[in-house]
Structure formats: C-alpha cells, structure tokens
C-alpha cells in the first residue's frame, strides 16, 4: 500500500492522509483510496472533519470527501468540542461545524477548545475564552496550556502556576497535603508552608495565610517558603530574613542565604561564607568548638 504513495500518514478516525504526485488525499483502513489526491495539503480527521488546503486557502471536508466548509481561511485547526480555530486577515477566531463564524477573528493566536475553554493570545499575552466567546480568564500570561480535569498550567515572568476555570491559582498546603484556591487578583502564588504562601503582585512578593488574607505586604523582589518560622527574602539583589509577622529580623545585605536550622543559618557575602543567628549576628567557633556570637 505505502509503495503506491509518496507519503502515508497515521490513521485518524478511519482515514490516513496520503500524498501522490504532490497532491494529498485519503485512504481507508483497507488501503482503498477513499478521497482523491487533489488537495495541496491535508490534515487528519477529527470530529468528522479534516482541514484541506487549496490554492493557498484552508477549508474542511467531511469523511465522504465533500467540501463541507469552503476553502477561504488563511489558517485552520482541527475541530474539537464542535469548534475550530480559523485565521482571517492575520487574526484568529472560531467557526462551528456548519462553517458559521461563532467567535470573531480578533486574537493573535488561538488553541483548541478543551472542557469548554480555549487558550487565546492577545497583545503577546495568553488567557482563556468560553464557547460563547466571552473572556473567561484575562490575557495576562506568557503561556497557557489546555484545561484538563478543571485545571491548566500557565506561565508568567518565567514562573509556572496551576489555575482553575475561574482563573484562581491552585496551590498545595505542604503541611496538610491539600489544595487551596488563591485569588486571581494576584499575579502568581506559591505553595503553602507553615501556614503561609508567597504571592506576587505588580512584580513584588508578599505572603497570605490559609484564609487568603494578605498578612505580609508585597514588597520583596523574591520570597522563599517559611521554614522554622523564618523566610528568606530579597530586596535590591540582597538576601535577608523576615519572621511570620513580616518583621525584618535580618537586614537584606547578603549575596546568598540558606534557611535557619536550630537557630543558625549560612549566608554569603563578597564571596565569603558566614554563620549567623536569628538576630543576624555572626557566629564563630573557638578552639574548643564553642559557638561565639559577634
């Protein structure tokens, strides 16, 4: 069978794309030519339709090989959940299986519908619309993946997050091993540890409690988990420490910092390593291996 064609693709819904003399068509699972090789390009079938290219324009055929939707689009994707993304005049929108324009072509990019939502791109940012074309989740992410079981992965400022269909962040409470929803009013959120989670707003980090209340203002350039009652934070490229009240217990003045263990932490400054206590004082060890505060 393959010897009769220049190319044979994978089977999708009982048909495989084949190429003969620079034209594309389809065979069935018996190897029979089901749809003539007459298209300039062709994609696999999905939900009973396949994208085909004719004279530089995309349209759709059905499994009988009939031209179900005219070749008039500049770009086109598979049908999924009854909608297909199509491109006209440099913008993407969606049509239904009747070929009707269901959602206006106004997006810079558009993905398939999954679980009633599709990721769309506008002004270099990704968000989500529903099947009515309503903006369900604002375009504010650098990248967005499809929803699966009500959750989707998104990226913003080189950080990866999980959101639900309301656009709220879903994070793990590591102490209780349960998931908690955090308001989409924040730009990002981390997992809970010791009752606090780092949240991002306007490129600054702060903390909320498990009730979702802002307990420490978003004013740090970076913020780590709380560990043994203290969190490492960054201001102006320098590391320091805060307590659970948000008080700056150790000034942000170090080039690097580790978590406190039994009241002591390793820090780095000017390529030198030191040990400090929770007051920020340096600790040295004498010949008798006694720790002395300086």
Predicted ranges, named:
Residues 1-294:
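Residue-level detector of conserved, function-critical positions
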């Amino acid at each position: 069978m393959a010897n009769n064609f220049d190319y044979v693709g994978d089977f999708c819904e009982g048909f495989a794309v084949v190429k003969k003399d620079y034209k594309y068509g389809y065979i069935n699972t018996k190897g029979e030519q089901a749809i003539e090789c007459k298209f300039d390009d062709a994609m696999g079938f999905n939900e009973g339709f396949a994208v085909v290219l004719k004279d530089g324009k995309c349209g759709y055929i059905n499994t009988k090989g009939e031209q179900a939707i005219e070749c008039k689009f500049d770009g086109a994707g598979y049908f999924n959940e009854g909608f297909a993304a199509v491109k006209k005049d440099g913008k993407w929108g969606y049509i239904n299986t009747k070929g009707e324009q269901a959602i206006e072509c106004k997006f810079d990019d558009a993905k398939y519908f999954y679980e009633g939502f599709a990721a769309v791109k506008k002004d270099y940012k990704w968000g989500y619309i529903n099947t009515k074309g309503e903006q369900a989740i604002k375009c504010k992410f650098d990248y967005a993946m499809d929803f699966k079981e009500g959750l989707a992965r998104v990226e913003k400022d080189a950080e990866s997050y999980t959101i639900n269909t309301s656009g709220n962040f879903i994070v793990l409470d590591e102490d209780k091993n349960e998931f908690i929803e955090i308001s989409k009013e924040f730009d990002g959120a981390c997992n809970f540890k010791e009752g606090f989670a780092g949240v991002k707003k306007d490129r600054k980090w702060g903390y909320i409690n498990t009730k979702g209340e802002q307990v420490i203002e978003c004013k740090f350039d970076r913020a780590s988990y709380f560990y043994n009652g203290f969190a490492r934070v960054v201001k102006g490229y320098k590391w320091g420490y805060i307590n659970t009240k948000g008080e700056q217990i150790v000034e942000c003045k170090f080039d690097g910092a580790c978590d406190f263990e039994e009241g002591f932490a390793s820090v780095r400054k000017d390529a030198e390593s030191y040990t400090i206590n929770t007051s920020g004082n340096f600790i040295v060890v004498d010949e008798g291996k006694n720790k002395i505060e300086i």
